[in-house]
Amino acid sequence: MSYRSTLNPQQQASRAKNAVAEFLFRQLIVPKVYVDARWPNPHSRVDVLAVDRSGAGDVHVVEVKIGTEVLAVSAGMVASLLQIPAHFRYLALFENNNSLPDETCLYAPDGLGRVGVIQVKEDQGGDLSSELRVRPERFRFDASFKQVDKFTAAHPAYIEIRP
């Protein structure tokens, strides 16, 4: 039985964000994971932000797309993701029936970096799982580590390993 039909789009997006947060938590080394993070400033927001190595490592950002948003994944959508300072950037697609965005739009204009693609699936029981479909490549990091340190000190993580 699928619960997707009884949930509104905001609930579906929140479930997908949670699945992606859990995926990054399992993939990275002692990450701090944030959902709906105000990164890189209070006026912008990313769906999922993870900072590896207990807040001292690489920055990973994810934009989650659900339903009809998945069908409209375009170069413009990827271009806005490229404006967010992060070492690794991802699109997470929920309800996309295995389709992937055009690979050429996933690369940085200078070729240094590729946006990863995470597919979020719901099984018959309503459980979500995430799978890496396109491996990301490292981007130039256009922010300072002081900015990362300030963010992690000021915001409680959604998921983290406590000492």
PLM-predicted stretches and their roles:
Residues 1-44, 53-55:
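Acidic-basic catalytic patches of nuclease active cores, encompassing PD-(D/E)XK
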Residues 3-4, 22, 105-163:
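Non-catalytic C-terminal interaction segments of nucleic acid-processing enzymes
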Residues 20, 48-74, 89:
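Conserved catalytic cores of phosphodiester-cleaving nucleases, focusing on short active-site segments
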Residues 20-22, 38, 47, 76, ...:
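Intrinsic disorder/low-complexity segments
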Residues 66-120:
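Catalytic cores of nucleic-acid endonucleases
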